Curated annotation (Swiss-Prot):
Keywords: mRNA processing, mRNA splicing. Interacts with HNRNPA1 (via the RGG-box). Interacts with IGF2BP2. This is HOXB-AS3 peptide. GO terms for biological process: mRNA processing; negative regulation of pre-miRNA processing; protein stabilization; regulation of RNA splicing; RNA splicing. Blocks the binding of HNRNPA1 to the intronic sequences flanking exon 9 of the PKM gene by competitively binding to the HNRNPA1 RGG-box motif. This inhibits inclusion of exon 9 and promotes inclusion of exon 10, suppressing formation of the PKM M2 isoform and promoting production of the M1 isoform. Also suppresses HNRNPA1-mediated processing of microRNA 18a (miR-18a). Promotes MYC stability through interaction with IGF2BP2. Residues 1-53 are annotated as: Disordered. It comes from Homo sapiens (Human).
Length: 53
């Protein structure tokens, strides 16, 4: 699997991105800005990520 931009800084969080179901980009944004907060335009991602945090 290719390393996506931004994941190298947080290699331990790549699993969280995948578990969130919102894709690497939305997962990265949510993780960097405010973990656990609803990501704009990603309702399903938020719901799936809630138990993960």
């Amino acid at each position: 699997m290719p390393v996506l931009p931004g994941t190298q800084r947080y290699p331990h969080q790549r699993r969280r991105f995948q578990a969130a179901g919102g894709g690497a980009e939305s997962g990265k944004r949510g993780s960097e800005e405010a973990p656990g907060v609803a990501w704009s335009g990603s309702e399903s991602g938020r719901d799936a990520a809630t138990p993960a945090w």
